[in-house]
Regions:
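Beta/alpha (TIM)-barrel catalytic core signal, keyed to glycine-rich beta->alpha loops juxtaposed to Asp/Glu
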Residues: 1-178
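Conserved small/polar residues in nucleotide/adenosyl-binding loops
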Residues: 183-189
Length: 193
């Protein structure tokens, strides 16, 4: 696979290689192969949000930092759960009701709603919307270089851009986010909980 990607770059069909959904050890192997092939590799795309912190547990985030490779986070708002969209129930025009492929009604449990409300309160205390805080949190340490957001309205894009105005978090804020997001999950070694 790395050979095919290198071939695409060397033939001029692509400028750089980007990978998707690798864990830390696999990223390290891929980077070594691409380096040997003298092929520029710059980015890895993975799902990442306050509710899905797999890249912290599988070593990808630490490996990307060590190798100085970027990460593009997709689904940073957890399919809309990390917005104010579902705070008062499931709207009829919501993704859950109209599509259901990526976000199912069963995902919005009472326990999840409690977490969303806790995070919403924390965001309000920071002077941000929940979506702004969720995006700011992803960008807080400079390891994730970009986020992919889906917007159904232009104003959602403008609101999401506001996230970059406040990417600083106190230790207490990070601890609270960790406490909410790691309920029933295995903690990574760098957790503050």
């Amino acid at each position: 696979t790395m050979g095919a990607l290198a071939s695409a770059v060397q033939s001029g069909k692509a400028l750089y290689v980007g990978l998707s959904n690798y864990d830390g050890p696999t990223l390290e192997k891929a980077e070594a192969i691409l380096r040997d092939l003298k092929c520029p590799f710059v980015i890895n795309q993975n799902r990442y949000s306050i509710f899905d912190r797999t890249i912290e547990k599988n070593g990808l985030k630490d490996t990307a930092k060590k190798l100085e490779k970027g990460i593009i986070a997709f689904s940073p708002l957890a399919q809309g759960l990390l917005t104010d969209r579902y705070l008062k129930g499931i709207p009829e025009d919501s993704r859950i009701m109209t599509d259901g492929r990526f976000l199912k009604k069963s995902a919005l449990t009472e326990e999840k709603l409690v977490k969303i409300r806790e995070l919403n309160g924390l965001a309000a205390g920071r002077g941000q919307t929940l979506a702004e805080m969720a995006l700011s949190w992803i960008l807080k340490d400079g390891i994730v270089t970009s986020v992919l957001v889906g917007a159904s309205k232009p104003e959602q894009i403008l609101d999401n851009i506001k996230a970059i105005q406040n990417t600083e978090f106190t230790e207490e804020e990070l601890r609270k986010i960790d406490a909410v997001s790691y309920t029933h999950l295995t903690l990574p070694t760098n957790s503050r909980v």
